[in-house]
């Protein structure tokens, strides 16, 4: 059983999200440790990206602040390595395919394994295109978290059957952010 799956041992999990490097990388490390103290079962760490198409204004602005502060993927890996000296809480990256592709799949997931990243969520990677990346991630003990958006029953069953770690349910169409209601 993976560390990500273990986070759901009580049937549900508290999973907060934060953008790495907002306002700076040192505070991100402190925030992760404080989130664990506050009861987090797993923490999503957003790797900032210049074009976060699935994100609403709050996370877009956090990404821009982080990038402006000089946050890089290497600095995030170093921060995670430091966090790992203090906690073993499951950590999952939330990022887009471009930064992972640019880093190189093998190099990226080797580094994830070295520093102790347990999973990854890539919202702009279609299920049908995750084959090569998924195989490399699995070889480095990194769960690729599947997303399920409103779709056909057959597609939901297919994605769910192949899921690892947990399933990220996209509850509404559009970008992330505050909603006055969620229509299902």
Where are these regions (language model features)?
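Conserved, mostly hydrophobic/aromatic
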Residues: 16, 35, 46, 112, ...
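Catalytic beta/alpha-barrel core
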Residues: 68-71, 116-129, 143-151, 157, ...
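Active-site mouth loops of central-metabolism enzymes
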Residues: 14-28, 92-104, 143-151, 179
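Glycine-enriched alpha-helix->loop->beta-strand junction motifs that scaffold or abut catalytic
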Residues: 39, 112-118, 138-144, 161-168
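N-terminal amphipathic alpha-helix/helix-capping segment at the start of soluble metabolic enzymes
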Residues: 1-17, 81-84
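Glycine/Thr-rich beta-alpha phosphate-binding loop at enzyme active sites
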Residues: 59-62, 69, 157-184
